Amino acid sequence: MVDHAPFETDISTLTRFVLEEGRKAGGTGEMTQLLNSLCTAIKAISSAVRQAGIAQLYGIAGSTNVTGDQVKKLDILSNDLVINMLKSSYATCVLVSEEDTHAIIIEPEKRGKYVVCFDPLDGSSNIDCLASIGTIFGIYRKTSANEPSEKDALQPGRNLVAAGYALYGSATMLVLAMNCGVNCFMLDPSIGEFILVDRDVKIKKKGNIYSINEGYAKDFDPAINEYIQRKKFPPDNSAPYGARYVGSMVADVHRTLVYGGIFLYPANKKNPSGKLRLLYECNPIAYVMEKAGGLATTGNEDILDIVPTEIHQKAPVIMGSTEDVQEFLEIYNKDKAKSRPSLPLPQSRARESPVHSICDELF
């Protein structure tokens, strides 16, 4: 008789999880369709990433995207996969991608009620050296009764109904944030399904790791450099923080989520508005952080409170464990006190409901 003991027979897959949440909400099923289609794209990208060398997908395609990054062959493939799968979900009306100058308006016969902003392959500069890369996405509900347009994507992050990222590393992990929490799913290649491995994830109140590209230190605001020095040489003689930086936002943020600490990509003299894009990098990751009990700020305001004016808008980013971010803001506010009043320290807003709650209405 065959021993099936090593195999779990009642596994919680992402599809099952979404269907259960949809049943609880009594929803229409559109969000389920959208997430299932997005997962199919992520599985295909995961496979392409692992076969890139054999399939000759490494290298540069000979062009740059709208934000000035050199476009890699995997970028193009990933972008096409996400766009085509989201179109075929019949759940979206507007798509915003890092790779496209303008928003993509879905054909009338395929339209649904959701707006999706995404970076199909974050950290693509790391492709050739095999470092971890990822896909980032944020999902909004269309709020106007007009014909779909680019303006439908210009919503603050507080309006997100779901957001998350896929990390293509030693395994493929999908982190999905909704109003009811943050859940992590790992791709099991043997059955081709994402399996729930961490439910209702919470970030530590305080970590011991900071993540920033110190190569830009000479162009940083003095408050940034002061904070970094305090992490290296604590004034109270406590243990210094460890420095970790991959250069792929998804990889650096996921480590911060798992271990606690702080991730910084601040503005500098060369990039006074920051470098990361608000709609498809900052907002989705900030949403994940807040739903996990952390904080995400520009230094001057919560990232999720920014009302965007254009789809490729940039923003500074400081996010992570609550106590670490608050410590940064104390230093930042003190440094700026001469020119403006100090800002109140934000509190964790993980339990606040956005305008539209995925667990209340969406499926």
Swiss-Prot record:
Cofactor binding, per record: Binds 3 Mg(2+) ions per subunit.
Chain sites annotated for binding Mg(2+) 3: 119, 122, 281
EC number: 3.1.3.11
Gene Ontology terms, MF aspect: AMP binding; fructose 1,6-bisphosphate 1-phosphatase activity; identical protein binding; metal ion binding; monosaccharide binding; RNA polymerase II-specific DNA-binding transcription factor binding
TM annotation in the entry: none
InterPro entries associated with the record: FBPase_C_dom, FBPase_class-1, FBPase_N, FBPtase, Fructose_bisphosphatase_AS
Regulation: Subject to complex allosteric regulation. The enzyme can assume an active R-state, or an inactive T-state. Intermediate conformations may exist. AMP acts as an allosteric inhibitor. AMP binding affects the turnover of bound substrate and not the affinity for substrate. Fructose 2,6-bisphosphate acts as a competitive inhibitor. Fructose 2,6-bisphosphate and AMP have synergistic effects.
Binding-site residues for Mg(2+) 2, renumbered to this chain: 98, 119, 121
Role summary: Catalyzes the hydrolysis of fructose 1,6-bisphosphate to fructose 6-phosphate in the presence of divalent cations, acting as a rate-limiting enzyme in gluconeogenesis. Plays a role in regulating glucose sensing and insulin secretion of pancreatic beta-cells. Appears to modulate glycerol gluconeogenesis in liver. Important regulator of appetite and adiposity; increased expression of the protein in liver after nutrient excess increases circulating satiety hormones and reduces appetite-stimulating neuropeptides and thus seems to provide a feedback mechanism to limit weight gain.
Protein name (record): Fructose-1,6-bisphosphatase 1
High-level lineage: Eukaryota, Metazoa, Chordata, Craniata, Vertebrata
Gene symbol of the encoding locus: Fbp1
